[in-house]
């Protein structure tokens, strides 16, 4: 089988990775995608490195059974913590959220990063961004309320606004004007963030990731031409993927297959 005709696996703990999937579909219309929302284990942000590795390993093996030419970690937590380890274990192209941002984001004096607790605790996101010498200060803000709210379908209203004010308070004190959405769930909240803080520039790394995926596929002569299909999988509840995912992609996700990763964390 021609390797270029194989699909691309993309995963997240839930519906968040759909924000990356949309950019990939727009830039790579000739590709087939397999999207996995690991909803049985959401949120990833409160999990240990060991738990994330067990899940990541099982997900890569699932994609390899399907037959893929590349796996996209559409999850900042997994990108920072497990991708560096898993790419040494498996002979398949991999791309995450952090490196494309690091390479492509323009220089800023100060930048804030909204992220999960696990991403913030790892210290890797801040370290990688500071290594570029593009930023004088990188402020990491853990946002534990965001993912559970989004997975329930709550992307606006009082709860979201209260959480957003709490998370932005330290950034405003430091006069930060550029804020990275360091979790793929967070673009669902862009409207609320911009309503509350219209002078803040919100940076979504998804477009950087899509461009990097395109570059790697082209470099390896793996660009597909006859695709255009997306298959959706979940490990638990499918509601958020069907509802919010459909809204974000602009079409109905009517078929979602439930799978068992056969792991205990």
Curated annotation (Swiss-Prot):
GO molecular function, one term: glutamate racemase activity
GO biological process: one example: cell wall organization
Function: Provides the (R)-glutamate required for cell wall biosynthesis.
Assigned protein family: Belongs to the aspartate/glutamate racemases family.
SUPFAM superfamilies: Aspartate/glutamate racemase
Catalytic activity line of the entry: L-glutamate = D-glutamate
Protein source organism: Carboxydothermus hydrogenoformans (strain ATCC BAA-161 / DSM 6008 / Z-2901)
Keywords: Cell shape, Cell wall biogenesis/degradation, Isomerase, Peptidoglycan synthesis
Pfam families: Asp_Glu_race
Entry's EC annotation: 5.1.1.3
Top EC class for this record: isomerase
Positions annotated to bind substrate: 12-13, 44-45, 76-77, 184-185
Keyword Cell wall biogenesis/degradation found: yes
Metabolic or biological pathway, per its Swiss-Prot or TrEMBL entry: Cell wall biogenesis; peptidoglycan biosynthesis
Name of the featured protein: Glutamate racemase
Annotated TM spans: none
């Amino acid at each position: 089988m021609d390797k270029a005709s194989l699909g691309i696996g993309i995963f997240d703990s839930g519906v968040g990775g759909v924000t990356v999937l949309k950019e990939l579909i727009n830039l790579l219309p000739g590709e087939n995608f397999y999207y996995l929302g690991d909803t049985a284990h959401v949120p990833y942000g409160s999990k240990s490195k060991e738990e994330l590795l067990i899940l990541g390993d099982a997900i890569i093996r699932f994609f390899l059974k399907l037959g893929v030419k590349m796996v996209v970690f559409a999850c900042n937590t997994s990108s920072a913590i497990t991708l560096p380890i898993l790419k040494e274990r498996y002979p398949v192209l991999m791309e995450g959220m952090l490196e494309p941002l690091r390479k492509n984001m323009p220089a800023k004096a100060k930048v804030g990063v909204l992220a999960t607790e696990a991403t913030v605790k790892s210290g890797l996101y801040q370290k990688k961004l500071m290594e570029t010498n593009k930023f004088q200060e990188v402020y990491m803000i853990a946002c534990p309320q965001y993912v559970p709210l989004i997975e329930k379908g709550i992307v606006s209203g009082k709860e979201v606004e209260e959480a957003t004010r709490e998370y932005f308070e330290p950034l405003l004190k430091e006069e930060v004007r550029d804020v990275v959405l360091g979790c793929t769930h967070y673009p669902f909240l862009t409207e609320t963030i911009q309503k509350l803080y219209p002078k803040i520039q919100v940076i979504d790394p998804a477009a950087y990731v899509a461009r990097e995926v395109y570059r790697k596929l082209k470099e390896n002569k793996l660009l597909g031409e006859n695709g255009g299909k997306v298959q959706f999988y979940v490990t638990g509840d499918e509601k958020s993927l069907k509802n919010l995912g459909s809204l974000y992609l602009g079409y109905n996700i009517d078929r979602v297959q439930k799978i068992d990763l056969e792991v205990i964390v």
